[in-house]
Curated annotation (Swiss-Prot):
Biased composition (Low complexity): 38-50, 67-83, 134-147, 211-237, 255-279
Organism: Homo sapiens
Name under which the protein is recorded: Proline and serine-rich protein 3
Cellular component terms per the entry's GO annotation: centrosome; cytoplasm
Coiled coil regions, renumbered to chain: 419-451
Keyword Cytoplasm attributed: yes
Sites bearing Phosphoserine, chain numbering: 408
Length: 480
């Protein structure tokens, strides 16, 4: 093969028809043929590292393209061209950016220098997203059109697109900051209004609750009828109207309250507590009740009467128990009640409900006097109004405790002084119970004998109660 001939023939040359043929023509070196070249500048950048630096001077710079075409012939003379310079001889053709959006992004990817994401795509919302917040802002469509116009369509070199990108990014960041500030101010103002309205509503509710608490024991029904309309469901209503129903005056609304900010800043003074407005009555004072009950207990203990509440002092309790043991009637029910009054270490009986001072005085006056042991009056049941009989549950509980005490042999807790006293009282009560049962059986036998004897016709019939009373008086006289 002749070296003077080119490697590729005219038919196979991708560069079109070129005149061949002069002795001073140096053919180019062997080149690989690619069927389609999208961007000569991209292939040039991949082949030559210094290509971007050379492109910065311009595509028509004589430093890069050193081809010389003698005037005597139409063939080029390339005395010192390299393969990369031969490949980069045609001027870079840019894709028209007006064709499509993809072409614009391709041009920017090829020509522009690398930039950060913050400069290319600012974070956060754009001004067009909040166009209703700014009255002097232009139309969103014009903003988008202006943004599209700011993008350069053709970039012959990389210095100008970089400056344009930086400028457009700075212009985009400034409105973004303004929008953020306006948005923050708008949110803060809305938050302040909502907070103030909620605070005013809470103040109204607190005032209403305090008024209801203070007026529960001191206000009259006409005063207690004052009410306020509830606020709206969203809780953001800054106004409220209060209505006071009155029989002499018609229903008329008061002047509306001040708005929520003013109401929150200057709240109305809360009503005074109930203790300062209306003091408690003596009947409602627990200390007064306790003092009256203590005085009544002491008076009953000193007189030796049958007390329905045991004294609190141990000495008085022992004295009252000793007096009651001598003065109680010899009945089974009275023994059970006595066991109730005696405290037990295993269980504690429920205290009786305290009465008012008037009822306590009535009870003291109406209580029957103490009967002597063995008197006939002890057999008669007392009137139901004068005796506060305990409930059936208390009687059953007392019976259970008494049965448990009788079943015990006294060997448990022998060193306990309280149990020793209680056991001594239990032994005394058992002895008195046996004596009372014996006397009761004797009296009943005598009553049966007297009932079988018929009185004379002239004398009026005598009742068994009168006979038992006379027998009791005689027995008491014998005992004394």
């Amino acid at each position: 093969m002749d070296r003077s001939l080119p490697v590729f023939s005219i038919q196979d040359s991708p560069f079109g028809d070129a005149p061949l043929g002069r002795s001073h023509y140096w053919p180019s070196q062997s080149q690989t043929w690619c069927p389609k070249t999208l961007s000569p500048s991209r292939s040039q950048r991949s082949r030559l590292p210094q290509a971007p630096k050379a492109l910065a001077t311009g595509p028509n710079s004589p430093e890069l393209f050193e081809e010389s075409w003698p005037s005597s012939s139409g063939t080029p003379s390339l005395p010192s061209t390299t393969e990369g310079q031969m490949w980069a001889s045609p001027a870079p053709t840019l894709i028209d950016s007006g064709d499509s959006v993809v072409a614009k992004y391709i041009n920017r990817f090829r020509q522009a220098q690398p930039t950060s994401r913050e400069e290319r795509q600012p974070a956060g919302p754009t001004p067009a997203d909040f166009w209703w917040l700014q009255s002097d802002s232009p139309d969103p469509s014009s903003q988008s059109a202006a943004a599209g116009a700011n993008k350069p369509e053709g970039r012959p070199h990389t210095a100008v697109p970089t400056a344009v990108n930086v400028t457009s990014a700075s212009h985009a960041v400034a409105p973004l900051q303004e929008i953020k500030q306006n948005l923050h101010t708008w949110n803060s103002s809305l938050l302040d209004l909502e907070t103030l309205s909620l605070q005013s509503r809470a103040a109204r509710l607190l005032k209403r609750s305090k008024a209801s608490i203070s007026s529960s024991s001191s206000l009259s029904p006409s005063d207690a009828s004052t009410s306020s309309f509830p606020t709206s469901s969203d809780g953001l209503s800054p106004f409220s109207e209060t209505f006071i129903p009155d029989s002499s005056k018609g229903l008329g609304p008061r002047a509306p309250a001040s708005p929520a900010p003013a109401q929150a800043q200057t709240p109305t003074p809360a009503p005074a507590p109930a203790s300062s407005q209306a003091p408690l009555r003596p009947e409602d004072d627990i200390l007064y009740q306790w003092r009256q009950r203590r005085k009544l207990e002491q008076a009953q203990g000193s007189k030796g009467d049958r007390a329905w509440v045991p004294p609190l002092t141990p000495a008085l309790r022992t004295l009252a128990e000793s007096l009651k043991a001598k003065a109680l009637p010899p009945a089974a029910g009275s023994v059970i009640r006595k066991s109730e009054a005696t405290p037990s270490p295993g269980a504690c009986l429920q205290p009786e409900v305290p009465l008012s001072p008037a009822e306590q005085a009535t009870t003291v006056k109406a209580s029957p006097p103490a009967f002597q042991v063995g008197s006939p009056e002890a057999l008669a049941p007392p009137p139901p109004a004068a005796d506060h009989a305990p409930s059936e549950a208390l009687l059953a509980q007392a019976a259970l405790l008494l049965q448990a005490a009788e079943d015990s042999d006294g060997s448990e807790f022998q060193d306990d002084p309280v149990l020793q006293v209680l056991r001594a009282h239990r032994a005394e009560l058992s002895r008195q119970k046996r004596e009372a049962d014996a006397r009761l059986s004797f009296l009943l036998d005598q009553a049966e004998d007297l009932g079988s004897w018929s009185p004379p016709a002239g004398s009026p019939p005598r009742s068994p109660r009168r006979l038992l009373r006379r027998e009791g008086d005689s027995l008491e006289a014998r005992r004394l």
